[in-house]
Amino acid sequence: MIAPALPQRKRRALLMAAALVAAPIALPALAQAQPPSATVPASAFERDRQAILAQAGQYRVHFEMRENVSFDPDYDPLEEKLSGGAEIVRVVYDEGDRISLQHILVMQHGEETVVVKHWRQDWVYQPQSVVTYEGPNQWRLTPVSEQDRQGAWSQTVWQTDDSPRYGGVGRWTYDNGLSMWTSNPTWRPLARRDAVRNPVYDRYLGINRHVLRPGGWVHLQDNMKMSGRQGAPVAIVQEDVINTYEASTSYSPQPGDDYWAATKGFWAAIRAKWDEVLARDGGIYVPEEAATGTVTGTPLMELAQKLQDGEVTEAAAIEQGRAIIERATRR
């Protein structure tokens, strides 16, 4: 049985946090990393690793979203949208050629602190495959050619409930004083901030850049918003997204760390279940809703909250969570 809903206040907090960004398990055995090539100096591999790990920390985050150029005569670009928050980024695991970083929002509302598990980014060195978005409700494991994976890292972004969002492959570069990773063009579903408006576009084709900077890092997105409803995708409008992570000690990270300590076992089991589905089906089918994202999002987040509140045991939460994913991913 799925756990009953949280009080309306907590549900609103979950949905608000999920809408902040164009967001945020290990990859299955089918997506194994290859060991560092003998042709790549060990120091280069380690330099990449340290650049990835440098994204962990405690931050104030600023989100800037701006539609710039319309390619549809009937579409006017939206006004700039600004938001922000406090977010910690913690290392879930570091296995050398596989690194996982979990983002957790720590929000203050008057006297109350609300913690929400946010997106997650997984990095794999020289991946054999990557999880990619195929269209409404569907993701698949896409092979990566030997040429494309040589010296490269995949980054897979997972949503708040550890369901997939998008994945891409790229290389870290260190030119012009910048430590920067740049992805290949990647398809992704609409962020909730767009989906709730029922816009003419229904997907993004984006290029991601993760760039280290003094006192933090920045996530740059160059998104072409596309409509695929009439067949082949057609460009509607180009958007820039700038998510800036600035190191901060102006708030206590403890509520976020307490949440993660209480729920990380549950989320490890949830990641394993998503892995199981990926391996079983060669991808993931899961329905999406405009306001809440994948249909698994709200019930899984509520289960984690009930676990932290002591209203359900970890074993029971895991059993219910696995059942939620199983039902949602069966056509």
What are these regions (language model features)?
Residues 1-9:
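N-terminal secretory signal peptides that target proteins for export/translocation
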Residues 11-21:
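N-terminal export leaders
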Residues 19-30:
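Hydrophobic h-region of N-terminal signal peptides that target proteins for export
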Residues 28-54, 66-80, 95-102, 107-110, ...:
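Amphipathic/hydrophobic helical signal segments and adjacent flexible N-terminal regions
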Residues 56-64:
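A short, Trp-centered hydrophobic/proline-enriched beta-strand micro-motif
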Residues 77-79, 83-93, 102-104, 120-121, ...:
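Hydrophobic/aromatic beta-strand elements that line small-molecule binding cavities or substrate pockets
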Residues 105-171:
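Extracellular-facing segments of soluble proteins and assemblies that are Gly/Ser/Thr-biased and enriched
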Residues 150-205, 225:
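Short helix-loop boundary/capping segments
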